[in-house]
From Swiss-Prot:
It comes from Drosophila melanogaster. In the adult, expressed in the superior protocerebrum and the optic lobe medulla of the central nervous system, nurse cells of egg chambers in the ovary at oogenic stages 1-10, and spermatogonia and spermatocytes in the testis. Expressed in embryonic and larval ventral nerve cord and brain lobe, and the larval imaginal disk and larval salivary gland. Also expressed in larval synaptic boutons and retinal cells in the optic disk. Keywords: Cell membrane, G-protein coupled receptor, Glycoprotein, Membrane, Receptor, Transducer, Transmembrane, Transmembrane helix. One of its GO terms (cellular component) is plasma membrane. PROSITE patterns: G_PROTEIN_RECEP_F1_1, G_PROTEIN_RECEP_F1_2. The gene is Octbeta1R. Residues 1-111, 161-186, 245-270, 373-383 are extracellular. This is Octopamine receptor beta-1R. The lineage of its organism: Eukaryota, Metazoa, Ecdysozoa, Arthropoda, Hexapoda. Glycans are attached at N164. Residues 450-461 have a biased composition (Polar residues). It is a multi-pass membrane protein. Disruption phenotype: Fails to respond to starvation by increasing locomotor activity. Decreased basal levels of locomotion. Overgrowth of octopaminergic and glutamatergic (type I and type II) neuromuscular junctions. Increase in the number of terminal type I and type II boutons and in the motile filopodia-like extensions (synaptopods) which form during the expansion of type II terminals in developing larvae.
Length: 508
C-alpha cells in the first residue's frame, strides 16, 4: 500500500470519527472529550497537507518509511519538505555538473575546428604568396590572380574569422556597435573579393585554353592590373558604404543595434539581400560555370584532335616504312610535344574544376539560407546552424591553397622548396628516387648550380650528397632538352585537307 493510499485512508477515518463525536487514538480505542481532539485535528490537517504536497509532486510517494503500518506520522511536513528540497538541490547540482562538462567539451570542439580553419587559411595562403615570390616559374599572368586571391583569403581569416570565432565561443558580442559594423563590412568585403578572384581566374583560364594564340594579346599586364583593381574596389560598394550608413537593414533593427552594443546581428532588408547576393555569389557563380563548361568543351575537342593526329602520325610512319624512305619524322616528335601540352591544359582545367566545386560546396548553402531568410520574415533559423553555414563558407579560404598544393605540380614543388628553406632540418636527409619529378618542374635560377660548384670545390664531400647534386644537375640538363623540344614549332597536320595532301590513303 503506497503512502498516498495510507494517508487517504487515515484522513478519512479521522474525519469520520470527529463527526461522530468521539475519536479513537491510533494506539487505543478510548473515548475522550472534544478538547482532547485538537491534536488529532492537527494531525488530520497534517495528513491533508501531506496529500496536497504529494498531489503537487513536492513529496515522492515512495517515502514509505515516513509512515509505519498502524503508527502515527512522526515526521513533520516541514522536515519532509526540507529533505525533499535537499534531494532536489543535490539532483540539480549533479545535472549542472553534467551540463558543465558537456558545455566544456562543446567549447573545446569549437575551438579546435575554428582554430584549424583559421591557421590553415593564414599559413596556407601565406605559403602561396611566398612561393610565388621566391620561384620565377610561378610568376605568370594567371598566378597574379592567385597571389591576389591568397591575400584576400588571408584577410578573411584575420579580419572576419577571428571576430566570428569570439562570438561562436563566448556566445556574445564584446566589441561595441562600431566594431560590429566594421566586422560585418570586413566580412562582406573580403568574402566578395575572394569569390570575384575565382571568377577572374576562370576567365583567365578560358582564354588560355580556348584561345591560346590570342591569350598574350588579351591578358596583358595592363588588363590584369585593371581587373585586379576592379576586384578590390567593387566589393566596397556592397560592404562599407551600405553597412556603415545603415542602408543594409531596416530602421527599427538599426536603432535596436545602436541601443544594444552587446548585440551584433547581420539582419538585412530584402533589397540589400537580393543585390548583395547577386553581386557576391550568383553572378560570379554563373560566369564561372559557363567558363568551365566552355573549357571542358574545348579540352574534349582538342583531345579528339590529338587522337586524330596520333592516327595520322602512325599512318605516315607505316607509309614511310613500306616505301623504305629513310627520312626524319618530325611530326611524331612534335606530336608528343602537343600531347604534353594538352595534358598540362587538361590538368589546369581539372584544377579549375576542383576549385569551382569547392567554391560551390562551401558557399552555396550559405547564400541559399541568406536569400531565403531575408525574403521570409517568419522563417527562424537556429543560431548554431547559422554559425555552421558561416564557417563552411569560411573554409573555402583555407581550401584554395590545399587544392593548389595537391593538384598543381608547380605549386607542389614550390611549396616543397619553400618549406625546405624554412625548415631545413626537416628535409635534411636526401631521399634517392624521390622529388626528381618535382625538381624538374621548376627552375629556380641557380641554387643547384651553386651547390654543384660547392661540391667541386670541396672534392671530399659525402657520397650521398654528391649523388644528389649529380642527379639534380643531370635532371636540369634533361629538362632543358625537353623544354627545347616543347617549344618547337607545331607542324603536325590537323585538318583533313592537310592529311589528304600528305598521304592519299588517309581517310577520316
Amino acid at each position: 500500500m503506497t503512502l498516498l493510499q495510507r494517508l487517504q485512508a487515515m484522513s478519512a477515518t479521522t474525519t469520520r470519527t470527529i463527526l461522530e463525536g468521539s475519536i479513537s487514538s491510533f494506539g487505543g480505542g478510548t473515548n475522550e472529550p472534544l478538547a482532547s481532539k485538537i491534536p488529532v485535528l492537527e494531525e488530520s490537517a497534517s495528513h491533508a497537507r501531506y496529500l496536497k504536497f504529494i498531489a503537487d509532486g513536492l513529496i515522492d510517494e515512495g517515502l514509505g518509511s515516513a509512515v509505519g503500518s498502524g503508527s502515527s506520522i512522526a515526521v513533520s511536513v516541514e522536515d519532509v519538505v526540507a529533505g525533499q528540497a535537499q534531494d532536489i538541490q543535490a539532483s540539480e547540482g549533479s545535472t549542472d555538473d553534467a551540463d558543465g562538462s558537456s558545455h566544456l567539451a562543446l567549447v573545446f570542439v569549437k575551438c579546435f575546428i575554428i582554430g584549424f580553419i583559421i591557421l590553415a587559411a593564414i599559413l596556407g595562403n601565406m605559403l602561396v604568396i611566398v612561393s610565388v615570390m621566391r620561384h620565377r616559374k610561378l610568376r605568370i599572368i594567371t598566378n597574379y590572380f592567385v597571389v591576389s586571391l591568397a591575400v584576400a583569403d588571408m584577410l578573411v581569416a584575420l579580419c572576419a574569422m577571428t571576430f566570428n570565432a569570439s562570438v561562436m565561443i563566448s556566445g556574445k558580442w564584446m566589441f561595441g556597435s562600431v566594431m560590429c559594423d566594421m566586422w560585418n563590412s570586413f566580412d562582406v568585403y573580403f568574402s566578395t573579393a575572394s569569390i570575384m578572384h575565382l571568377c577572374c581566374i576562370s576567365v583567365d583560364r578560358y582564354y588560355a585554353i580556348v584561345q591560346p594564340l590570342d591569350y598574350p594579346l588579351i591578358m596583358t599586364q595592363r588588363r590584369v592590373f585593371i581587373m585586379l583593381l576592379m576586384v578590390w574596389l567593387s566589393p566596397a560598394l556592397l560592404s562599407f558604404l551600405p553597412i556603415c550608413s545603415g542602408w543594409y537593414t531596416t530602421t527599427e533593427n538599426y536603432k535596436y543595434l545602436k541601443s544594444n552594443p552587446h548585440i551584433c546581428e547581420f539582419k538585412v532588408n530584402k533589397a540589400y539581400a537580393i543585390v548583395s547576393s547577386s553581386m557576391s555569389f550568383w553572378i560570379p557563380g554563373i560566369v564561372m560555370l559557363s567558363m568551365y563548361y566552355r573549357i571542358y568543351q574545348e579540352a574534349d575537342r582538342q583531345e579528339r584532335l590529338v587522337y586524330r593526329s596520333k592516327v595520322a602520325a602512325l599512318l605516315l610512319e607505316k607509309h614511310l616504312q613500306i616505301s623504305q624512305i629513310p627520312k626524319p619524322r618530325p611530326s611524331i616528335q612534335v606530336e608528343q610535344s602537343t600531347i604534353s601540352t594538352m595534358r598540362r591544359e587538361r590538368k589546369a582545367a581539372r584544377t579549375l574544376g576542383i576549385i569551382m566545386s569547392a567554391f560551390l560546396i562551401c558557399w552555396l548553402p550559405f547564400f541559399l539560407w541568406y536569400i531565403v531568410s531575408s525574403l521570409c520574415d517568419s522563417c527562424i533559423t537556429p543560431r548554431l546552424l547559422v554559425g555552421i553555414l558561416f564557417w563552411i563558407g569560411y573554409f573555402n579560404s583555407a581550401l584554395n591553397p590545399i587544392i593548389y598544393a595537391y593538384f598543381n605540380r608547380d605549386f607542389r614543388a614550390a611549396f616543397k622548396k619553400t618549406l625546405k628553406s624554412l625548415f631545413p632540418y626537416a628535409f635534411y636527409f636526401c631521399r634517392r628516387g624521390r622529388g626528381r619529378d618535382d625538381d624538374r618542374d621548376l627552375e629556380f635560377g641557380g641554387p643547384s648550380r651553386r651547390g654543384t660548384n660547392g661540391a667541386q670545390r670541396t672534392g671530399s664531400g659525402s657520397a650521398e650528397m654528391a649523388n644528389c647534386v649529380n642527379s639534380t644537375a643531370s635532371s636540369e640538363i634533361h629538362m632543358s632538352v625537353m623544354r627545347a623540344r616543347q617549344y618547337a614549332v607545331n607542324v603536325t597536320p590537323t585538318t583533313d585537307a592537310q592529311m589528304q595532301q600528305l598521304h592519299p590513303l588517309y581517310t577520316n
